[in-house]
Amino acid sequence: MSKKTSTIPTYGRYPELDRVRFPADMRNLSVDQLKQLADELRSETVDAVSTTGGHLGASLGVVELTVALHAVFNTPDDRIIWDVGHQAYPHKILTGRRDRIRTLRQPEGLSGFTRRAESEYDPFGAAHSSTSISAGLGMAVAHHLRAEEDPSYHERNVIAVIGDGSISAGMAYEAMNNAAVAGPGANRLIVVLNDNEMSIAPPVGSMSDYLSRLMSSRQFFSLRDLAGKVAKRLPGKIERTAKRAEEYARGMITGGTLFEELGFYYVGPVNGHDMSQLVPILRNLRDADDQGPILLHIITEKGRGYKPAEAAGDKYHAVSKFNVVTGEQKKAPAGPPSYTSIFSRELMRRAKTDDKLITITAAMPSGTGLNAFAKAYPDRFFDVGIAEQHAVTFAAGIASEGLRPFCAIYSTFLQRAYDQVVHDVALQNLPVRFAIDRAGLVGADGATHAGAFDLNYLCCLPNMVVMAPSDEVELLHATATACEYDAGPIAFRYPRGNGIGLDLPEKGEVLEIGKGRIVREARRAPNARGGVAILSLGPRMHESLRAADQLAAQGVPVTVADARFAKPIDKALVEDLARQHEVFITIEEGAIGGFSSLVVQHLAETGLLDKVKFRPMALPDRYIDHNTQDAQYEDAGLTAPHIVRTAADALGVEVAQQSA
C-alpha cells in the first residue's frame, strides 16, 4: 500500500474506484464498469462527508454525470467548470484528491468548493452561483484565439455544469445571450443544465431518452443543417414559416425553445443517472463540429442513492457530521439562539402590528431566517430566487410606494447587487432595510463566503445608515430601529452563529440614529487624561471587554465603547474618547478601509488625530481560509490578546498576556 492510499480508510473496499487515481485511468472502462465506479464513488462520497459535514445532496445528484464527463472528455485539457461548487466532491475524489477528501472544509484541508490553487482539474474557482457559463465562454474564446495564433495549439472543450437554481440568475442568461454572437470560439462550449427539481421539463421517459440520443448524433446535426439550407432557398415568408414550425416541433418535444432562441443547440432532457445514455450523448457532443454552443439538459435527483438524503426535505443539502447507517446528524451542544433567529423573532413580533413590513430574500429563506415569516405572512414574503440585483431594486420599488421592505441577504451575496444599492436605493434615498447576515468571518465556507466588505461598500454611500450590533440584545434593538426608520436606507450587519447568552428583553428598543454608548468607563482621577479607549463596532465587543480586564489588572485604565453605528459615527463620542485617552483603538469585523476610516477622517478634520495615538484594528489585507470562526479571528489578529498587544505597543509598556 502506498503512502497515498494508506490515508484512505476505505481503500480495498471499492475495486473500481481503487483503480482510479486520475481521470485518465477511467477512459478505457466500459459503460458497465463506469456504472460500478459511480456506485462506489457515491458510497465514498457519503462516507467522507459523514466525517466532515458539507454539501452532500448536490454531490450525490451528479455522481453519474461526474464519472461520464471525466470518462468522455480529456480533462484537465478539456475544462469542466462546476457552478457554485457544492456538487464538486465526487469530482475531487476522481481528480487525485481522494486521499485528502476527509480534510474537506477542515483547517488546511480541501476547500468545499472548486479552487484553482488546489488542482489543475479546477480551472475556475467557484462558490457564488451563476458564473460558470460566463467563465466557460471566456475560456472557449481564449482557446480559439490562441489556436488561431499557434497552429500547434488545439482547441479544448469547455463544459459548464450549472443547476436549475443557478441558471435562474440574470448573469447566466447574459452569458448565453453573448455566446450566440461570440464567434467560433463558442463552438466548443457545452452547458450542462443539471435540473434536480424537474422545474423546466416534463418527466424523463424512453421517448425523451431516444430523442436526446438522436438529436446529439452527427446524423441529426447534418439533417438539421440540411433542413436549414433548404429553408433558406424558399421564398422569405415560407422560410420563416418553416423555421417557426421546426422550432415549435422541437419545443413541443424537448422543451428547449428558450435555449434555442438564445442561440444554443438544445439536447434533452436526459436521465442524468443513466450511464448508458450519458456516455454516448456526451461523446456525440464532444465530437460535434461547428454547431455553436450546446446545452445538454439532464434530470437528476438531489441526494440520489442515499436513502436518508432521498427522504429528507432538503435532500441533505448541507449537513453536519452524521452516522452513515442511520443518517442521523450530530447535533451541536445546546447554546444561545442564533443571531439569525433573533432577527427573525423581532421581525415577526413587529409584523403582527405593522402590515407594511415586507420581506425579500434571494433563494435563502431558511438561511436568512425568513421561513417562519413566509409561513405566517405569505402575501408579504418574496423569494426572488438567485437574483440579488432584482431583489434590491424590487425592494426599492416597494419602498417607493410607502411600504417597509426588509431585504435579507448574506453579506457576501449583497456584493452582487452593489450598483442597485447605489443607484436604485441610496441615490433615491429610499427606505429599504438591509438585514445583512453572515457578516464577518464565517468558518468552514472560507473566504468565498466571508462578509468582509459590506462596511466598506456601504459606509461610503450618502444617505446610508449602517448599524453593527455587538450582541444579541443589540440585534433586537437594531431590528426595531430599522423597522421604524423611514428617512432613507438603513442596513444592519450580524454574524453567523449563536449569541453570547444574554437574557433577551421581550422587544427591541428603537435607537437614536448615530449614537453609541459607553460600556465600561476607565477608572482614574477626575479630569485626568490617559489610558486606552477601545471603540468596538459589532461582535468584537466581547473580546474588547476581555482585553480591558487584562489591561486594567495591570494598572492600565481602559474605556470600552460600543459604536453601534458605523455610519453616521457618533462624533461626540469619538471626540471625547480621543480627548480623554492617550491611545485610541478601533476594532471591527471588516476589511481595511471601513469603520476606522470614518473615525480617523473625523479625528483628522477636528485636529484631534494629532493629539492621540490612533490604532485601527480590522481584517488584514488578505483572504482568510476556511477554519473555525475562532481560529479565523485568531489568524486575523482580532482577539483580546491582540488588542492588549496593540495597546501596550502604543503605550510603550510591557504587559503580561493572560491565557484564554
UniProtKB/Swiss-Prot annotation:
Biological process annotations from GO: 1-deoxy-D-xylulose 5-phosphate biosynthetic process; glyceraldehyde-3-phosphate metabolic process; terpenoid biosynthetic process; thiamine biosynthetic process
Functional description taken from the UniProt entry: Catalyzes the acyloin condensation reaction between C atoms 2 and 3 of pyruvate and glyceraldehyde 3-phosphate to yield 1-deoxy-D-xylulose-5-phosphate (DXP).
Cofactor: binding details: Binds 1 Mg(2+) ion per subunit. Binds 1 thiamine pyrophosphate per subunit.
Gene Ontology molecular functions: 1-deoxy-D-xylulose-5-phosphate synthase activity; magnesium ion binding; thiamine pyrophosphate binding
Protein name: 1-deoxy-D-xylulose-5-phosphate synthase
Catalytic activity: D-glyceraldehyde 3-phosphate + pyruvate + H(+) = 1-deoxy-D-xylulose 5-phosphate + CO2
Subunit architecture: Homodimer.
EC number annotated for this UniProt entry: 2.2.1.7
Family: Belongs to the transketolase family. DXPS subfamily.
Gene name for this UniProt entry: dxs
The UniProt record lists the keyword DNA-binding: no
NCBIfam families attached to this UniProt entry: dxs, PRK05444.2-2
SMART domains referenced in this protein's UniProt entry, alphabetically: Transket_pyr
Recorded metabolic or biological pathway in which this protein acts: Metabolic intermediate biosynthesis; 1-deoxy-D-xylulose 5-phosphate biosynthesis; 1-deoxy-D-xylulose 5-phosphate from D-glyceraldehyde 3-phosphate and pyruvate: step 1/1
Binding site for Mg(2+): D164, N196
